From Swiss-Prot:
One of its GO terms (molecular function) is rRNA binding. It comes from Gloeobacter violaceus (strain ATCC 29082 / PCC 7421). Keywords: Ribonucleoprotein, Ribosomal protein, RNA-binding, rRNA-binding. It holds the Pfam family ribosomal_L24. The lineage of its organism: Bacteria, Bacillati, Cyanobacteriota, Cyanophyceae, Gloeobacterales. Part of the 50S ribosomal subunit. This is Large ribosomal subunit protein uL24.
Length: 116
């Protein structure tokens, strides 16, 4: 769901945050697990370590040699699911309020609390 505060591009609402462990649920990298290294709110995408690798060819510049670079490309956030390292299982996310009154994210299948 996108929200727009009247100016600029729409910002998407995310179920994942930087540092979360996620599993890819569709596409060429289906089943791969990695950490979210960056969140791109205006594009609705995330960058996951070791997933959606692309090769970039760099031409020689002056005294530098040409080379090929491998880097992660963004992937839509709807194509990833939060992943429990303890149970080795992907799960949807839910929200609950703790006894201290703090709203936290919880994995629905395992009951694991994500926010500390």
């Amino acid at each position: 769901m996108a929200t727009n505060n009247g100016a600029g591009k729409a910002r998407h609402k995310f179920h994942v945050k930087k540092g979360d462990t996620v599993q890819v649920i569709s596409g060429k990298d289906k089943g791969k697990v990695g950490k979210v290294s960056e969140v791109l709110p205006t594009a609705g995408k995330v960058i996951v370590e070791g997933v959606n690798m692309q090769t970039k060819h760099v031409k020689p510049q002056g005294d530098q040699q040409g080379q090929t670079l491998r880097r992660e490309a963004p992937i839509y956030s709807c194509k990833v699911m939060l992943y429990s390292d303890k149970k080795k299982q992907a799960s949807r996310v839910g929200h609950t309020v703790t006894d201290a009154g703090k709203k936290v994210r919880v994995l629905k299948k395992t009951g694991e609390i994500l926010d500390k």
